[in-house]
Swiss-Prot record:
Protein name: Replication protein E1
PROSITE patterns attached to this UniProt entry: SF3_HELICASE_1 (PS51206)
Keyword vocabulary terms for this entry: ATP-binding, DNA replication, DNA-binding, Early protein, Helicase, Host nucleus, Hydrolase, Isomerase, Isopeptide bond, Nucleotide-binding, Phosphoprotein, Ubl conjugation
Organism: Human papillomavirus 45
SF3 helicase domain span: 444-594
Length: 643
């Protein structure tokens, strides 16, 4: 039997000291030494020099004590590391264990069983006696909380099959085995999840208390650019998250950043306005570089610009201590959080939209819709238009009314007033000389051209049509198109001559043009449009509308055929004024036209030749820019009281 533990018993422990003391006791009859006095009191004065208190000896003792303490700490650390290493390999299967076949279920059950085991044969499955703390690598965290059972079953062919069954352990044991590195494991689980977006949305709603989709609108394409972006970034290091608030400022005009802890690390919610438009891929790449987080761990979408709830959330959290805000607040947040704007946006006025389209010379529905929608940030009526469910109806009504007003305005003007009105819409800075130089280059006498142009603009019978004749590449179309563009004339194409409505544009224009007339076109003119070339009233068929009778506007033609030289059209010779362009149009070495003809040059040309063209301006039109009825207004004006 082994000696019992403790201090009781003879000859063991501290009792040995007392045996020695009894041996040296005085016996009867012993002679007492002269230098020993029994009656003397022991004061300990004879032990004064027994302890050496010199400095060197004390320092040596302290060093030895420190070394012993350091050694004890190292032993404890090594034991802990060894224990964790054993725990790591003990949690795996036999195939993954470095011990190979020597690792058995008995070893997992208790470390002491290995010392008394005679062999490592297969035994029946037993329960785990106790659980060992996690190694910290995360790979065996779940296994430590489960009970593993190995079952040997006989297969049909006589062999044995090893199967493992596991059941969940106690949740309190799992809470004790939490390790600081578990966030890395859970972040890996996020990366390996089948639906990463759903997992991130669930965690976001659990942390912030609202859905991420309540704050953003969805961009299906990653290439769509936007200046404002809302992002939720998962698994950010706390130190990096603090530095992100400073690093993002140089690239943004506005930054609203919130940081909260989640099971994957720090969860950052940010609303950023960049200095220039970026797409989702560019934003994700930049954030991944700054935060060292994979792009798959980010939710990036543009914010809801018309949601009062979303704007109120950014406003309320921006003034609280949970957020870090820098820069000027976006205008859409200011607009949606001001009560007065919210009241004004609820009322849409169609006349306001019609007035805007009329002032900007817009009659196309697509242009109206696009440009008016861009005013929603600064125009309350445009914002109400976007909120309406009848945008298509309002847009169609606006385009129809604008065309009616434009058509009536044009009909009220004569040619002089219309040219004056068009000149008022063109900027200054033109030069009339390139037009005159180009005519001289083509051999056209300038005085003859002015005389024909004066009769052309007045619509004089037999002088209502001008033909620019010449070979190809002589600048006929360039000269004619620039003239029509300045006067906002209409273009008719003979390709549509099979339709009854191909002349319908003549009803709403002051001047028209047909480019590149062919033999077929001249034959059609000779058969059906002699009175139109004369400048007499004609009847035009319009689609879904009754026939319209009007005086045909002046028509400018370009062609490679001179009808006056062909005997097939003898009746067109007196109705067409011909100017020949025989020379090729010149270009400089850079490919630019030598004679630049644009709206500014035509404005300067008409201002220079105003009197020669017999264009008159009434005194009452001098203050109204040529418009006989002044500035058009279709909105309710405000009454003004004189001082």
């Amino acid at each position: 039997m082994a000696d019992p533990e403790g201090t009781d018993g003879e000859g063991t422990g501290c009792n040995g000291w007392f045996f020695v003391e009894t041996i040296v006791e005085k016996k009867t009859g012993d002679v007492i030494s002269d230098d020993e006095d029994e009656t003397a009191t022991d004061t300990g004065s004879d032990m004064v020099d027994f302890i050496d208190t010199q400095l060197s000896i004390c320092e040596q003792a302290e060093q030895e004590t420190a070394q012993a303490l350091f050694h004890a700490q190292e032993v404890q650390n090594d034991a802990q590391v060894l224990h964790l290493l054993k725990r790591k390999f003990a949690g795996g299967s036999k195939e993954n264990s470095p011990l190979g076949e020597q690792l058995s279920v008995d070893t997992d059950l208790s470390p002491r069983l290995q010392e008394i085991s005679l062999n490592s044969g297969h035994k029946k499955a037993k329960r785990r006696l106790f659980t060992i703390s996690d190694s910290g690598y995360g790979c065996s965290e779940v296994e430590a909380a489960e009970t593993q059972v190995t079952v040997n079953t006989n297969a049909e062919n006589g062999g044995s099959v090893h199967s493992t069954q596991s059941s969940g352990g106690d949740s309190s044991d799992n809470a004790e085995n939490v390790d600081p590195h578990c966030s890395i494991t859970e972040l890996k689980e996020l990366l390996q999840a089948s639906n990463k977006k759903a997992a991130m949305l669930a965690v976001f709603k659990d942390i912030y208390g609202l859905s991420f989709t309540d704050l953003v609108r969805n961009f299906k394409s990653d290439k769509t650019t936007c200046t404002d972006w809302v992002m939720a970034i998962f698994g950010v290091n706390p130190t990096v998250a603090e530095g992100f608030k400073t690093l993002i400022k140089p690239a943004t005009l506005y930054a609203h950043i919130q940081c909260l802890d989640c099971k994957w690390g720090v969860l950052i919610l940010a609303l950023l306005r960049y200095k220039c438009g970026k797409n989702r891929l560019t934003v994700a790449k930049g954030l991944s570089t700054l935060l060292h987080v994979p792009e798959t761990c980010m939710l990036i979408e543009p914010p809801k610009l018309r949601s009062s709830v979303a704007a109120l959330y950014w406003y309320r959290t921006g003034i609280s201590n949970i957020s870090e805000v820098s820069g000027d607040t976006p205008e859409w947040i200011q607009r949606l959080t001001i009560i007065q704007h919210g009241i004004d946006d609820s009322n849409f006025d169609l006349s306001d939209m019609v007035q805007w389209a009329f002032d900007n010379d817009l009659t196309d529905e697509s242009d109206m819709a696009f440009q008016y929608a861009q005013l929603a940030d600064c125009n309350s009526n445009a914002a109400a238009f976007l909120k309406s469910n009848c945008q298509a109806k309002y847009l169609k009504d606006c385009a129809v009314m604008c065309r009616h007003y434009k058509r009536a305005q044009k009909r009220q003007m004569n040619m002089s007033q219309w040219i004056k009105y068009r000149c008022s819409k063109i900027d200054e800075g033109g030069d009339w000389r390139p037009i005159v130089q180009f005519l001289r280059y083509q051999g056209v006498e300038f005085i003859s051209f002015l005389r024909a142009l004066k009769e052309f603009l007045k619509g004089t019978p037999k002088k209502n049509c001008i033909l620019l004749y010449g070979p190809a590449n002589t600048g006929k179309s360039y000269f004619g198109m620039s003239f029509i563009h300045f006067l906002q004339g209409a273009i008719i194409s003979f390709v549509n001559s099979n339709s009854h409505f191909w002349l319908e544009p003549l009803a709403d224009t002051k001047v028209a043009m047909l480019d590149d007339a062919t033999h077929t076109c001249w034959t059609y003119f000779d058969n059906y449009m002699r009175n139109a070339l004369d400048g007499n009233p004609i009847s035009i068929d319009r689609k879904h509308k009754p026939l319209l009778q009007l005086k045909c506007p002046p028509i400018l033609l370009t062609s490679n055929i001179d009808p006056a030289k062909d005997n097939k059209w003898p009746y067109l010779e007196s109705r067409v004024t011909v100017f020949t362009f025989p020379h090729a149009f010149p270009f400089d070495k850079n490919g630019n036209p030598v004679y630049e003809i644009n709206d500014k040059n035509w404005k300067c040309f008409f201002e220079r030749t105003w009197s020669r063209l017999d264009l008159h301006e009434d005194d009452e039109d001098a203050d109204t820019e040529g418009i006989p009825f002044g500035t058009f207004k279709c909105v309710t004006g405000q009454n003004t009281r004189p001082l």
